[in-house]
């Protein structure tokens, strides 16, 4: 009998949406909004390839959604990266078909490491904040890619 793993057909992740191309960044910014009108689920990957700064410096990466490309709501706040943190990947899912059964307050950002999975919109963007407490040019290299389903 053959190995059952040989017959597994991988499921495609979906259309790739670049929310933040891989680059070294030294300051916070908003990424470019990407239309997600025909999407009901987003698989979002944060790929941090380098953090070259002091331990007290931080990187916070967010994914925001918008119904109108004007009002932005924070849906994902990835786990905070220390300035001397190791390279790594973080993954989160937003699913419009699973909105949940409770009201979600969205007047402020989610806490670090929190996903608001039912929060969805016609537009999506990445956003990041870099704290440089040592004043010596904190630098983090990362990308954010969403796979639209």
Question: What is each residue range found by the language model?
Answer:
Residues 1-149:
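Surface-exposed, low-hydrophobicity beta-strand/loop segments enriched in small/polar/acidic residues
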